[in-house]
Structures are given as structure tokens and as C-alpha cells.
Amino acid sequence: MTVLTVPQDAAAPAAEPAAAPLPPRYDDQWIGGRWTASDADSRLVVTDPATEAPLATVPAGTAHDADRAVRAAAEAFPGWAATPVRERTALLRRVVEGLERNAERFAGLITAEVGAPSRIALRTHVGLAVGMAAHCVETAASYTFEERVGHSLVVREAAGVAACVTPWNTPLLLTVQKMLPALAAGCAVVHKPSELTPLHARLLAEVFAEADLPPGVVNMVVGTGDTLGAALVSHPLVDVVSLTGSTRAGRQVSALGADGVKRIHLELGGKNASLVLDDADLPAAVAATVDQALFNTGQTCLQWSRLLVPRDRQDEAVELARRAMDGYVTGDPRDPATDLGPLVSAAAYARVGEYVRRGATEGGARLAHGGPGRPEGLTTGYYVRPTVFADVDPLSTIGQEEIFGPVLCVMPYDDEEQALRIVNGTRYGLHGAVWSADDARAERVARRFRTGLVDVNGGSFNPAAPFGGFKQSGIGRECGNAGLEAFLETKSMQLPQEQGGQVVGPRLRATPPAGAARQERNDG
């Protein structure tokens, strides 16, 4: 099936203003297996953060758009849930193939609307998404959906209509991380991408369509969180809501879903610490921390934004971090030599700049590298300077709040116990790292992190392991079996027993009369 989507040249560099054509205009939403006109009166401008020029306009979706998408999903759900798992996974393998075929198109769109450097968009944004999608499908293919427990048959079945609300920072990866498990579980999905980055989602709708999923199983609607998102989350026919976003957005979604007692899964923010113990290889640990902290220009929930080092080695660590940052190139994301692109929007540029200014003026922190404003030579685009603060008070604003930019806060500590208090001393609990010359010591310390993920001496991400946070970093888990189970309900079917067995449960008689067990089963 061929679906009209963003033209392949949408990610090309902007022309000179005097000759620039009007940006593409899209007026439709993907509902019930086809593009249908939105009834939105207003529009959203999708902006290239590197040039500040418009890329396209899309509808500011309405509550009516959300309602139509949810009803299409609800109509498709029974048939999709009843489809055997082997058939669902076979169709979803076509989706994985479609992601691979369109990898360069996805990368171009992500570079254009997110500002991710082109080689990183292809290798990481898209490459990880393809790998994650494949892993999700194979997890479902090997999952045990039914098992006997004593005289009960325990069945795990699709939870219903799932609303998947995804962010702008690593949009394709975080979308497939939700949608593929939901679809593999047998749920019908309504996807709401961020209004900042909807263009890749149009291409994703095409990929699903070409895989021949039944109409209504996948729907995609674009709009703001306050209008379309709120209508989607609160819709009475939505059974499960899965959101990745800010902690503020998570609170709003929880409140909106409370009246319907919906299942809510939240992957939220983080103020993640990289803890370098006193026996660790400091240069290696600092280099790894800086590299991770700068990925996606610091716009990831997993970012190690706090670097904890022994007090007597802080100056050395700061110098190592400063030199490491100097080795990264900030600039045009379409240039293969670029490591750091712009922030995603003018609002993000203003927010990060304000944090940097506050960090330099309060709490006794020392600005060791970078600072507010654009890097030298860049006058257009939402570019910021990679920044290092030293002597950061763990209780200060920059020590506590998620900045979501390329800002590293170095915090000295005096002993292991103090270091762990600092690590665990925020409202977040998503990710962390610990570095030591002794793997056993590093693992022991990692067990004391109040976080959902900890990298021990550079251990890499594992898509089979649960992903999620403690405290205000979220509720629930994604990835692996846990990610699939987020979209499943569990049913226990008590099967008839041999005569004379003891009855346990809300019964008046100790044992059922002859034939009662068989009769109850026939009548039920």
C-alpha cells in the first residue's frame, strides 16, 4: 500500500529566504488505515532547529480527531487480539523490514526535525530503533502467553486500546519501544508523536501500512498535549496509556487517567549520576561520562548530567572533562563531521541558557567550560555551548533539576557513603553509572543506587532487560518481557478438579456436590 508522506527532500538544506518555497502542508491524520482530513482550525509549524526555518505545517489535532482514532482502534481491537501470535509477529517482522528499507529516509527526517547529526541519526536513532523493533517482535514470538498453575490456566491477553504518547528527543526509538510490544501483545494503538517532530511519524505510518496490518490497528494523530493529548488519555475507550516525557507531563497524564482508573505507564525524567570511585581509572571514566552526557546534545532522559569524583581528584576530573568537550564538533547536523547539533527548539534554547546562567551565579558553582549563548561562529540555529560546572552543590538548582542540555555538573565527595547520598539525593531515579578497578566493588555500590538502571564499569544497554525508573522517573517498565507485559492483562481460569478435592474459596460447602464442578464449567 502506498501512502503519501513527507517528500524525500524535506531534510535538504533550506534555500535562501528570498527563493524559499512554501513548506509542505499536511492536513490529515492516519486513522482507520487511511489518511483522513483533520477538522483542526489551527496549524502547527515544524521548524528545522539548525536553520530556524519552517520544514512543514501539520494540523493542531482536535479532541474529535482523538475520538475518531480511538474508535477506529476500538473497532479493530477484537480481531487483532484474536489473531494468533505467530501471525501478528509475522506481520510485525514486515514492519522491521520496512524500518530497515527506509533507514536513510528516517535519518534525514530526524536530522531535519530534531537536529541530530546525520551520521548519529542513522547509526543510533534509526539503528537502535531497528534493533529494538526486531527484539520486541522476537520477544513476543517466544513469550509464554498461557501456562498451567495447579488446576488453573493462567492466560495473558491484550489489554485493549493503547495510547502511546512519545517525545521528540529520540522519537523513532522511543516510539517503536512502545508500539511494537503493544501490537505484539494484541493491542490496537493510537500514537501521538510530539508536535515538534511529527514528520518521521508520517513515514512510520507508511511503514505500518505497507506491512498490511489491518485498518485501525495503528492510528497516528498529531496535535498538542493540552488538547489532543488530553482527549486521548482521558478517552473512555482507551485502556492503557504509555507516555515518555517530562515529569510534569507524567503528573498531568496520571491525573487525566485517574477517573477511568486506566493503566498508566510513565517513563519520565532523570538527574543521573556517574560515580567514579577512588580506585577507578579516572581518565577513562570521565571520557565515557562526557561522551554519554553530550549524546543528542544532552537531550536524553538517560544523560549522565552529574559526575561525582573524589574531592582530591576534582581538579583533574574537571580538566579531563574540559579537554574532552573540546574534542567534539558543534555545528550543522547535515555535516558528517558534526558531533553535536542544535537543541530542538527556541524554548529549549532559552531553558538551557537560563540554567547555565543560574549555575554561574548561585550555589558557589564554578563555570569551568562553556557558558551561555551560541558557540563561536554560529549565529543561526538553537546551538549551545557544551558546559562544565565544578564544585556544584548537590542541593543547588543545577544539581537537582533536569537541564536537558549538554551541561555536566562535577560534584566532589569525601567518602563512599557521602557519594551514595548525593547519587540518591534527587527526586529522580532513572539511570546511573559506577566506575571502579574492582568489578565486585562496583556491583556492590551499584546495588545501592535508587535507580532503575545502572551501568557497571561501562556495561552496555541490553534491550532484553527492563528499562524504567524509580521515584519520579516513572512507573512501569519497558523492554524485554516487562515491556510486553505492560500491554497484557492476566486472567486465571480455574479448571475442574477430580471429585472429592477440598474447595478453597468463597463457597458455602466444604466440597462441591457430585458433578457440580463439571456442571459449573458447562454453565460458565
Place the predicted regions along the sequence by residue.
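Hydrophobic face of amphipathic alpha-helices that form TPR/SEL1-like repeat modules
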Residues: T2-A50, R521
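Residue-level signal for inorganic ion chemistry
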Residues: G33, E52, R88, I110, ...
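Conserved C-terminal structural/oligomerization subdomain of aldehyde/semialdehyde dehydrogenase
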Residues: T51-T57, V238, L275, V329, ...
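Short, well-ordered beta-strand elements within core beta-sheets of diverse protein domains
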Residues: P54-G61, A76-A82, C164, S274-L277, ...
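Long amphipathic alpha-helix in the N-terminal Rossmann-like dinucleotide-binding domain
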Residues: V70-R71, T89, R93-R105, A116-S142
